[in-house]
Amino acid sequence: MSPTALEVHDVAVKLATFVILRGISLRVPHGEIVGLVGRNGAGKTTTLRSIIGLVPILSGSIRLNGQELTNRPPHERVRLGIGYLPEDRRLIASLTVEENLLLPLWAADQDDGQNRLALIYDLMPEVKRLALRRAAALSGGQQKMVALARAVMAGRTLLLLDEPFEGLAPLLSRHLAEVIRALRDVAVLVTESDVNRMRLLTDQICTIERGEMVLEPGVGNSDASRIR
């Protein structure tokens, strides 16, 4: 197995008076894709948001290449090479596609935007064709593709993808899976509610239920279908 890029150990998250996550532990090696599968409300999104720093953790540790992330704000985590695709895409409608792609690098004060754009356009030529179009003019599928490209812009080391296939036609889902699998040397943690869609990407599947891990990657993956 490749060296570990992301290591989440015994993480708990409390929002208001509710403990949302309990004892979450997982690893994502460099160059590999790990899936996190669970019902709506199981804690998938909160897990990703805790890794990128959008929600604080109550206890435990989150490490990227051995560096503790717990006290680092989100923009510093982006500088370390973490890209995040939220489920709702969150493109800025008034900006062009290219401006949306550059946003995470601007926010993290990084100056290699043109090099990263060249990489994106090589990997996803359909995004290059949309570069000067306003985000408001894009279809839902195009928005999802651009949001993935924006995550890859920042995600030199780790990509966090929240329900990337949600709302997409099967053909576009397969294309998106091909793009994600084509990434080299990047660790990918992806969430899904449908284990069959997850298998478009990986057989390394964790299962989360009610904020707790119940299945680890590579262990009894066929049993994961029971959550559907």
List each language-model region with its residue ranges.
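ABC-type ATPase nucleotide-binding domains, specifically the catalytic core motifs of the NBD
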Residues: 16, 72, 97-117, 123-125, ...
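The feature captures the beta-strand-to-loop junction immediately N-terminal to the Walker
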Residues: 37-39
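Helix-to-loop junction immediately C-terminal to a conserved catalytic motif
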Residues: 52
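Conserved ABC transporter NBD signature motif
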Residues: 60-68, 80, 113-117, 215
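ABC ATPase NBD coupling module
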Residues: 68-89, 93, 117, 129-132, ...
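Conserved ABC ATPase signature
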Residues: 134-138
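ABC ATPase C-loop
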Residues: 151-152
